[in-house]
From Swiss-Prot:
Outcome (variant: residue 354 to K): Impairs septal localization
Record's keyword annotation contains Transmembrane: yes
Keywords: Cell cycle, Cell division, Cell inner membrane, Cell membrane, Coiled coil, Membrane, Transmembrane, Transmembrane helix
Protein name: Cell division protein DamX
Membrane disposition: Single-pass membrane protein
Coiled coil: 55-87
Segments crossing the lipid bilayer: 104-124
Subunit (UniProt): Interacts in vitro with multiple Fts proteins, including FtsQ and FtsN.
Periplasmic side: 125-428
Annotated region (Disordered), positions in chain: 1-99, 149-190, 226-344
Amino acid sequence: MDEFKPEDELKPDPSDRRTGRSRQSSERSERTERGEPQINFDDIELDDTDDRRPTRAQKERNEEPEIEEEIDESEDETVDEERVERRPRKRKKAASKPASRQYMMMGVGILVLLLLIIGIGSALKAPSTTSSDQTASGEKSIDLAGNATDQANGVQPAPGTTSAENTQQDVSLPPISSTPTQGQTPVATDGQQRVEVQGDLNNALTQPQNQQQLNNVAVNSTLPTEPATVAPVRNGNASRDTAKTQTAERPSTTRPARQQAVIEPKKPQATVKTEPKPVAQTPKRTEPAAPVASTKAPAATSTPAPKETATTAPVQTASPAQTTATPAAGAKTAGNVGSLKSAPSSHYTLQLSSSSNYDNLNGWAKKENLKNYVVYETTRNGQPWYVLVSGVYASKEEAKKAVSTLPADVQAKNPWAKPLRQVQADLK
């Protein structure tokens, strides 16, 4: 069955029409027959200004732009409202406040940094001035020329007091030569003595012989490095009692060392004059001199030595004969000690080793098959000390050359050339 469509009503059905003339034409013909006037629609002119009947489509079309205009107007109104609402938000003054706070905080931070820099700078400058004041106030004058008794009692000398012995001297260097030459010997002033330290630089000052040599030099020096035992001998004033108390506290072994230092510069004169005679006389005189006490021997050698130097030679040979009795009585020695005593003091010997144990030192020398070695006893810090030497050489160069002939184990000990005057001073 066909569906009904609204367009079907508008379509004319051809079956309904009459055959032949149409209805309008029939009516028109009837009117003409009756004589009624007819209206010719073709002659009628219609004004364009007349309103035609609007159709539905035209109404819908006319309504659509109106709706669009209303929508546009509503959108414009909403946009205007939004603009009106947004403008106050942009014009708020709250945004300017945080900016001003930031600037304030930045300014405060800069001020704090400046204060810190100023404080640190002042703190760094302040200790320099205070330390200079402290050092200036803490300076003390030290006078080495003061009396030894004052140092023992804790009394410091006055800052302005000076002695005639410690006067300043001008130091002048020798001129430099254009060609290589040997070094000039410095001029020895009064009261001074040149000291040559033998051996390696690493262990030269630790060896007992060098220490004893420095102690001997210190005795002859003008500085108050030793106890004031010389003061009562020269002056004989009221400080004699204090000097005796100080020397009594120290061991008795140091007393001969001080008295020997007085004889040292004068002993070579006696030995040079009496070289041919005392070689044969010394062993004979040691036998009757053995019972002599050891305390009397230093006194006999120290007091008459300055007077007997100008007298005859046989009188001077008696003093070394008495001194040789003291080491022969209680000292431990090995080898020909007499050859060291009788040799000239200007000669040299080789010191191979030293120890506090005599047996170990003597056994080591025998183990190395050493020839012409001598072990003699001396003192070190108040205790017995034994020294091993070998050979007698006319010069220092010969002694150094002889080191190459020694065994390898002995050369490892760094033997060094030692003046015989030091050995002879130790044997006294």
